[in-house]
Amino acid sequence: MMKWFMSTNHKNIGILYIILALWSGMLGSSMSLIIRMELSSPGSWISNDQIYNTIVTSHAFLMIFFMVMPFLIGGFGNWLIPLMLGSPDMAFPRMNNISFWLLPPSLFMLLLSNLFYPSPGTGWTVYPPLSAYLYHSSPSVDFAIFSLHMSGISSIMGSLNLMVTIMMMKNFSMNYDQISLFPWSVFITAILLIMSLPVLAGAITMLLFDRNFNTSFFDPMGGGDPILYQHLFWFFGHPEVYILILPGFGLISHIVMNESGKKEIFGNLSMIYAMLGIGFLGFIVWAHHMFTVGLDVDTRAYFTSATMIIAVPTGIKVFSWLATYHGSKLKLNISILWSLGFIMLFTIGGLTGIMLSNSSIDIILHDTYYVVGHFHYVLSMGAVFAIISSFIHWYPLITGLLLNIKWLKIQFIMMFIGVNLTFFPQHFLGLMSMPRRYSDYPDSYYCWNSISSMGSMISLNSMIFLIFIILESLISKRMLLFKFNQSSLEWLNFLPPLDHSHLEIPLLIKNLNLKSILIKF
């Protein structure tokens, strides 16, 4: 037991992150099912809108901070990056340990905040004055703020660790453009986290002081401005959505490269520059979340055009994935299915994002279900599809076992139908101007809402099926005999790898024939 509590091994800590993420994911999914059951027909089921809004808030926090980030950055980052770089472990193993162990208490505090009344029914954005003491007079929002602080500290420590690992523990003679795409994506994600999280910490600390110490940062009666909070929050919030998707881009790139049988992804260097471009542009478009707060027309014009420009590097990535698949004979195995599903659905989410980047259109669509449909296409079918496809793809590496291929294909089809049936109708609801975060609606919206709720039940069944498939493989212990057609360093290990895969950092030597030889020195 102490092996897990005090471990400084990147593989053990990666497994802990994955377990926490799975647990939080089940919790967050349960909350989304409660939301969809409430909305499956007109009329009230929960009969208390404060509780409904609390469920919406908790669903968002759980999925973002305790499911996607621990899975992609903590889980896969810890597990795969040292193996892909050929390094013995992370740069700061003990810091790695504490950056995980800050997450369970943070999760506990988030769940504890729901036990007070009024519970935090603010939405994940926690806008004042709704989150101020006047409208949430219990300690609930304070607990949520402390939870955010702890997970933020955890993320910053994990990011520093990953950055130093990628910069200092790669092969000594390797150039940066030779580092594979997943370490690159996590490196850029770490930069985004380190630059954006302190701004969030400042914003929620000011909110904490407004609530408890009678300051008025966000209170107009004392000369403050609630719009200041929105600017600070979204300066973190927009890079955050790229933090959620960029590691997924890196993982999907590896899967596409491996499954197409190519030695490298199409336009490897362009892919790196595209991710750098996305990371940079992500910081200068935050006010597109605020088109309705009364921005100046020139400001709206700037944020509209800057947001549209983000589509360019994203399009480069999508077409490079498709170009990598071009010309190879596709046998539709499970990794290819998931990667193609990711590319297709993420692209749909990107196109609805282009629609919303127009400030004139966004004035109409802001805070409707069109926005919910958009960001669930890029998160629930971008980030989550990246997580599931990567988990299935690297499961034989992590455990040395095989999943049941036929069942996985059935599960993929169920999931694909379920998520599309859930979120595609929400665009229609948004165009019919159904607002977000409301527990009841006129019966003119009944048809699409009932279809959406049916889709969420299909998705739930597919996730239960996936858990069953994983448990079945762990119980039956089918070992993997042959591994082939892999272009990445991590597959050169035993399956599962030893606790310490590399005892020292390898050296890459290029001889006169320009063939690379990997030797230990």
Swiss-Prot record:
Pfam families in the cross-refs: COX1
BP-aspect Gene Ontology terms: electron transport coupled proton transport; mitochondrial electron transport, cytochrome c to oxygen
Residues holding Mg(2+): 366-367
Matches recorded under SUPFAM superfamilies: Cytochrome c oxidase subunit I-like
Residues engaged in binding Cu cation: 238, 288-289
An MF annotation (GO) of this entry: heme binding
Gene3D superfamilies: Cytochrome c oxidase-like, subunit I domain
Residues that coordinate or bind Ca(2+): 38, 43
Residues that, per the record, bind O2: 242
Cofactor: heme; Cu cation
UniProt keywords, alphabetically: Calcium, Copper, Electron transport, Heme, Iron, Magnesium, Membrane, Metal-binding, Mitochondrion, Mitochondrion inner membrane, Respiratory chain, Translocase, Transmembrane, Transmembrane helix, Transport
Binding site for heme a3: 374
CDD domains assigned: Cyt_c_Oxidase_I
Textual note on the cofactor: Binds 2 heme A groups non-covalently per subunit.
Binding site residues for Fe(II)-heme a: 59, 376
Bilayer-crossing regions: 15-35, 61-81, 98-118, 143-163, 184-204, 232-252, 265-285, 303-323, 336-356, 383-403, 412-432, 451-471
Enzyme class: translocase
GO cellular component, as recorded: mitochondrial inner membrane; respiratory chain complex IV
Pathway it works in: Energy metabolism; oxidative phosphorylation
Protein family according to the UniProt entry: Belongs to the heme-copper respiratory oxidase family.
Function according to Swiss-Prot or TrEMBL: Component of the cytochrome c oxidase, the last enzyme in the mitochondrial electron transport chain which drives oxidative phosphorylation. The respiratory chain contains 3 multisubunit complexes succinate dehydrogenase (complex II, CII), ubiquinol-cytochrome c oxidoreductase (cytochrome b-c1 complex, complex III, CIII) and cytochrome c oxidase (complex IV, CIV), that cooperate to transfer electrons derived from NADH and succinate to molecular oxygen, creating an electrochemical gradient over the inner membrane that drives transmembrane transport and the ATP synthase.
Name of this chain's protein: Cytochrome c oxidase subunit 1
Native source species: Apis mellifera ligustica
Name of the gene: COI
